[in-house]
Regions:
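Repeated scaffold domains used in trafficking and secretory/extracellular systems
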Residues: 33-40, 77-86, 121-132
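Intrinsically disordered, low-complexity regulatory regions of eukaryotic proteins
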Residues: 80-83, 91, 100, 118
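N-terminal export/targeting and maturation segments
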Residues: 20-76
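Short, exposed beta-strand-loop hairpins at the edges of beta-sheets
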Residues: 95, 100-110, 114-115
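Short beta-strand elements that form the blades of beta-propeller/WD-repeat-like
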Residues: 45-53, 89-102
Length: 133
């Protein structure tokens, strides 16, 4: 009886671990809103952003279309990072963070700077908007 119970518990543990993995794998497509954690290009393809990690921080690396690094910045801790999103008609880049909220980085002369006065366009949907927060 103990052996059967042990086997059943092992099967249940494997099932739970597989279920959790499937949920995690689907998170970017279903829970990030307009934001992504994947490589993403500006509206015209002139720039693309790619995220890496350094210590406990997320690093946003911005490259030109010919793969030259243009600018790099660290917007938030990796544990709070929920993705980035380009605006549809500019090079403004929005960062979604669990502790800082949604922040805009505007570009001037290929330098992206935090713009606390920026107004998020309606078409950029936060994961928090979708959750009703």
């Amino acid at each position: 009886m103990r052996k059967i119970l042990s086997v059943l518990l092992s099967i249940a543990a494997v099932f739970i671990m597989c279920s959790c993995t499937l949920v995690s794998a689907s998170a970017p497509g279903t829970e990030y809103g307009s934001f992504t954690i994947e490589k993403t290009s500006s509206y015209d393809g002139k720039y693309y952003a790619y995220m890496t990690q350094h210590d406990q921080m997320i690093v946003v690396n911005i490259y030109s279309e010919d793969d030259n690094e243009v600018f790099t910045f660290e917007p938030c801790r990796k544990s709070d990072f929920w993705g980035i999103c380009w605006e549809n008609d500019s090079y403004n880049l929005w960062v979604q963070s669990g502790d800082l909220g949604i922040l805009c980085y505007t570009m001037s002369d290929e330098v992206w700077s935090l713009d606390l006065d920026a107004v998020r366009p309606d078409y950029i949907i936060s994961k928090y908007d979708e959750l009703g927060a």
